[in-house]
Amino acid sequence: MFSRRDFGRMALAAGPLSMAFGARIDSSVSGVQLGTITYSFRDLPRTAGKDNVDDLIAALTACRIGEIELYSPNIEPAPASAVKPAAAGPAYGVARGARTPPTPEQIAARKAEREALRQWRISTPASYYQAVRAKFDAAGINVFAYTLGFNADFTDDEIDAGFAQAKGLGVDLIASSTTLPMAQRVAPFADKHQVRVAVHGYANVKDPNQFGSPESFAKALAMSKYMRVNLDIGHFTAANYDAVAYVRENHEHITHLHIKDRKRNDGTNEPFGDGTRRLSRCWC
């Protein structure tokens, strides 16, 4: 069995050869299109001020993945706080064990990084995103959706820029881990750009502002004809809902599924087949 990091190391070694061919990578199985959100490759090394598109393509090619939901940090310049060598631990706030609180200096630095990212998003031309898409196309990888987490610190200009990014990448779908209040702000931009936004849910159904319950998804769908659901069947099961029933009743509003196996009652992630929900029933 190979870990995500093992795949990354193999991909970096095999990348130039595998990227030399542009034939479409077929990662479908029995007619079901399988792919990945590129957040799954968050352990790849980062360099300050640089994207990691080339390393990501090498990893995807090594894994024979031909369909992706492109995670925004992969195509954005990495902040200094996210930089790590290949052998380091996870970046972007993914930590093992307890973390010490940030110092005032670290808080100030991260605030400056956040503002720099905002300005980069607003000012970067469409040609940059078109060039990124061309790299994936040349590698035989289809960009199905763009993943951008609309957080409360987004300005309206930054929200608008997010839709321009998606269009530059040639996609009409943004997948977003966001909140109900933010979805209300985002929906008018979805109407303006005619780009779909699929909200991603978690297992926290106690917070009325979070997506996770069928009722919360219904509220999103009512905001705009462009709002959709990106159903994570693991989180949905952990929140004690029936993923199979929801898919059957709402499939026309679901753009894609995130597949993981979890136990009910906010249980742990499990190896495929060991959780509460029978995964195969969700795509039959």
Sequence positions of predicted segments:
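Active-site-adjacent beta->alpha loops and helix N-cap segments on the catalytic face
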Residues: T179-F189
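Alpha-helical scaffolding within the catalytic cores
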Residues: S127-V132, M182-Q184, G212-F217, Y241-A245, ...
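Conserved phosphate-coordination/catalytic loops
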Residues: T47-D51, S123-A126, D153, S177, ...
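Residues that line or immediately flank small-molecule/substrate-binding pockets and catalytic motifs
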Residues: S72, F150, T178, I254, ...
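N-terminal pre-domain/capping segments
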Residues: F2-L173, D191, V195-A198, A203
